[in-house]
């Protein structure tokens, strides 16, 4: 997902990430404010203890929200690997009518998923294979969209 510059979550799903999106955006803005402090030199004016606390806070925010820092609006669709483990993400997406594409194993209920992909969501090779196909399809779709925009601009 990094290759096509799409937001993703690899750690535990932060509850309310979609349904409480403004609060999550505030946390992301706080993370970028801490980054700005490091670049403009105000970080150096703080005491050693304050710098340590802010560095720890930054690391925690990066771990939980780093990959979604560029997410400025709710996603148009979601891809979930382990529906059984990430049931909160599925519930939030369903509540907001966001289509869900997901790998569904035998221990999961596919009724909540809009586009289930029957696959083993525990084996790393299976996950890697499906994610590679999905990433390739997304990249192809983005390229087609880009070509259409260029074609429309040329006309």
Specify the residue positions occupied by each region the protein language model found.
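Acidic-enriched and Gly/Ser
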Residues: 1-64, 68, 72-75, 86, ...
